[in-house]
């Protein structure tokens, strides 16, 4: 007895809730949920050692090149 062949798993269209998209409370709740999830994913990436960078890293086009080690083109203090 497979529930998917008997259509017991699928919901009819009548059971789907119609949520108004212009509700300020719903928009605020959705924004809070999204911010929470994005923070969770950012902390997860940091914990696993990944960097969430978009675009080229140091040394790439428009990058800073050698940014550490004191060999940059900044003021030397001499």
Curated annotation (Swiss-Prot):
Entry-annotated residues carrying Citrulline: 68
An example Gene Ontology molecular-function term: calmodulin binding
Tissues of expression: In the cerebral cortex, found in the cell bodies of neurons in layers II-VI, and in apical and basal dendrites of pyramidal neurons. Is not found in the dendrites in patients with Alzheimer disease.
GO CC terms in record: axon; cytosol; dendritic spine head; glutamatergic synapse; mitochondrial membrane; neuronal cell body; postsynaptic membrane; trans-Golgi network transport vesicle membrane
Keyword annotations of the record: Acetylation, Calmodulin-binding, Citrullination, Methylation, Phosphoprotein
PTM text: Phosphorylated at Ser-36 by PHK and PKC, phosphorylation prevents interaction with Calmodulin and interrupts several learning- and memory-associated functions.
Residue numbers bearing the Omega-N-methylarginine modification: 68
Collagen-like domain location: 48-78
Sequence segments annotated as region (Disordered): 39-78
Bias kind Gly residues: ranges: 55-78
Function statement: Acts as a 'third messenger' substrate of protein kinase C-mediated molecular cascades during synaptic development and remodeling. Binds to calmodulin in the absence of calcium.
Protein name: Neurogranin
Taxonomic lineage: Eukaryota, Metazoa, Chordata, Craniata, Vertebrata
């Amino acid at each position: 007895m497979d529930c998917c062949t008997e259509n017991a798993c699928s919901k009819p269209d009548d059971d789907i809730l119609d949520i108004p998209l212009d509700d300020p409370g719903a928009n605020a709740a959705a924004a809070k949920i999204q911010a929470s999830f994005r923070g969770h994913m950012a902390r997860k990436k940091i914990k696993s050692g990944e960097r969430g960078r978009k675009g080229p890293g140091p040394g790439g086009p428009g990058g800073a090149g050698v940014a550490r080690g004191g060999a940059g083109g900044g003021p030397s203090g001499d």
